[in-house]
Amino acid sequence: MVDLRALFSETGDIPWIVGLSGGKDSTAVTMNLIETLESLPPHIRRRKTCYVTCVNTLVEAPPVIDHVHRFIDELRKYIRDRELPVVVVELTPDVEQTFWVNLIGRGYPTPVREFRWCTDRMKIRPQTRFIKENTEIFGDPPVVHFLLGTRFDGSHARKKTMQNHTRIGSDIHSHGTMPSAGVIRPIEDWSTDDVWNYILKEEWADGGTNPFYEVNQDLAILYKDAASGECPVIHDPTKQTCAGSRFGCWTC
């Protein structure tokens, strides 16, 4: 079990970034971060700023992007009311890297297993650009820790990728494309049931009501009868997204 409270202190002022796709796993990590911050004394939690980034590819399925916007609205309201050191950042691909510019303008074929050009251009680059444009925060080269919702209980391919980047004896693992960055996997040992039980729980860390309970009920409905899994926050261009589930782009 990853101890986020301990890691928060151990990692000093190194910024944390949670990549929010809107799916169940990244939602769980986002909530886990918020609960962790609330459990820390104010003078400890203020040692670093955490970022929640969400990349809108501009071809997300309408029900999905509507849900993401609702969750982000609730998240922003909560962190503002609780004065938590969290900044929510919404990102989009550069115009010249959008789906239709590449498909129609450049004549690219629709993404396929052997040529999934969309992953790097539409998911990875916007976040990389955000980090590079803010060197005063992240440094150059950037020193940052990504909190990802990858789980060993996921697909075989994802499990293999996690194993390849695992640092034995540490909860901070290597990043696929950014050598100076690290990856923290707060829910790596959770089962799918663990994830759902967590995001749909009614209780919150302070004994109150889960502020995301209602919006997560809608998330559960989105998943109903859908393919398991969602497009994760990709940090390795060789990894495939999961077109076919409700959390893939509608174009695939």
Regions inferred by a protein language model and the residue ranges of each:
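Nucleotide-activated chemistry modules centered on ATP-dependent adenylation/adenylyltransferase
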Residues: 1-18, 24-252
